[in-house]
Every structure is written in structure tokens, then in C-alpha cells.
């Protein structure tokens, strides 16, 4: 008899609908490139030319740091400062390139 009473007072729980916390950019409206077009558009300037352009000041540092799809660059610029990547000095880059201390 106790089990009948327990089942009569059982509470029905409602599950909340899932709301995703991560927002991804909508890329469905962008046309897909063929393999040859994708390789041609993905060609980036060499590391040495990017450094020489940076030293001349002809290209903004934001453009050099974020050479991705334009929507990604806009998202990175809108991030609060505490979530952005710390700029790397020329000395740090050289240290990494040579593989550590000499």
C-alpha cells in the first residue's frame, strides 16, 4: 500500500530545452570552393616577407596576427583584452625559431 501512495505523489520533472553556449558563425551562405581554388586562396605570404612588411609598417599588426577568414578576424577584435593573445616580440619569435637557447 505504501508503494501506491508513493506513485500517486510522484512529481513529474520537466527537462529544459538545451541552449548551446557556443555560437558559431553562419558559414552556410558562403559558396564552397573547389580544391584548386581553395589552395590558391589559402596561399599566405612567407614568414620573412611578413616580417619585412611589419618592420616597414606598411601592414597593420592586426592583419598579420589574424590571417584567417574575415569573420574570425572580426570576432578576435571584438574579444575583451583578457581573452586576446599577447603580442609576441621579435626576440621571442627568434628564440622559438632557433629551438631554444643557443
Curated annotation (Swiss-Prot):
This protein's name: Alpha-ketoglutarate dehydrogenase component 4
GO biological process, one term: 2-oxoglutarate metabolic process
Residue numbers of N6-succinyllysine PTMs: 4
GO cellular component: mitochondrion; oxoglutarate dehydrogenase complex
Phylogenetic lineage: Eukaryota, Metazoa, Chordata, Craniata, Vertebrata
Region (Disordered): 23-70
Family designation: Belongs to the alpha-ketoglutarate dehydrogenase component 4 family.
GO molecular function: protein-macromolecule adaptor activity
PANTHER family given in the database record: 28S RIBOSOMAL PROTEIN S36, MITOCHONDRIAL, ALPHA-KETOGLUTARATE DEHYDROGENASE COMPONENT 4
Record-listed N-acetylglycine modification sites: 2
Positions bearing Phosphoserine: 48, 60, 89
Assembly: Component of the 2-oxoglutarate dehydrogenase complex (OGDHC), composed of OGDH (2-oxoglutarate dehydrogenase; also called E1 subunit), DLST (dihydrolipoamide succinyltransferase; also called E2 subunit) and DLD (dihydrolipoamide dehydrogenase; also called E3 subunit), and the assembly factor KGD4. Within OGDHC complex, interacts (via N-terminus) with E3 subunit and (via C-terminus) with E2 subunit.
Biased composition (Low complexity): 33-46
Amino acid at each position: 500500500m505504501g508503494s501506491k501512495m508513493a506513485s500517486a505523489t510522484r512529481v513529474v520533472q520537466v527537462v529544459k530545452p538545451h541552449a548551446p553556449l557556443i555560437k558559431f558563425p553562419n558559414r552556410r551562405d558562403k559558396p564552397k570552393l573547389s580544391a584548386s581554388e581553395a589552395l590558391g586562396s589559402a596561399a599566405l605570404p612567407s614568414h620573412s616577407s611578413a616580417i619585412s612588411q611589419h618592420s616597414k609598417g606598411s601592414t597593420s599588426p592586426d592583419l598579420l596576427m589574424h590571417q584567417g577568414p574575415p569573420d574570425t578576424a572580426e570576432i578576435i577584435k571584438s574579444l575583451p583584452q583578457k581573452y586576446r593573445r599577447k603580442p609576441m616580440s621579435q626576440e621571442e619569435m627568434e628564440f622559438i625559431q632557433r629551438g631554444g637557447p643557443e
